[in-house]
Amino acid sequence: MARRLRYILPEVAVHIIQRGVNRVACFRTDADYLVYLSHLRQLSVRHNCAVHAYCLMTNHVHLLVTPGSAESCTALMRDLGRHYVPYFNRRHERTGTLWEGRFRSCIAESARYVLACYRYIELNPVRAQMVDHPEDYPWSSYA
């Protein structure tokens, strides 16, 4: 069965969600979060993706990005996986895939929807009852 086509438009914000396989932890230590964020910063510049919001939960990632080209998001997520997964596997003495299939994405065409995505992403740790206030969660753009 063929995969559904991914529609990403240049200069239009995209909400990206990537889950850990079987919802296992993708980040176990503070160093894991820092390495992922370092790769995200470097690769977003390389692939011309403006990162507006992010939240790194223990078993999944939310990003709100605006790609410079139709291929930018896919290239960003591909290279994040190519850099982060080998690091994570080496660090935690494991093998195999870390992510559950392809990342999910949703185009945020209107300003109203972009703001809703910001709120959704940055309030994720509060909804998960990990913190009382979004500024208390160190692994999101809110902090």
Regions found by a protein language model. Give the residues of each.
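Short catalytic/metal-binding and nucleic-acid-binding patches
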Residues: 1-143
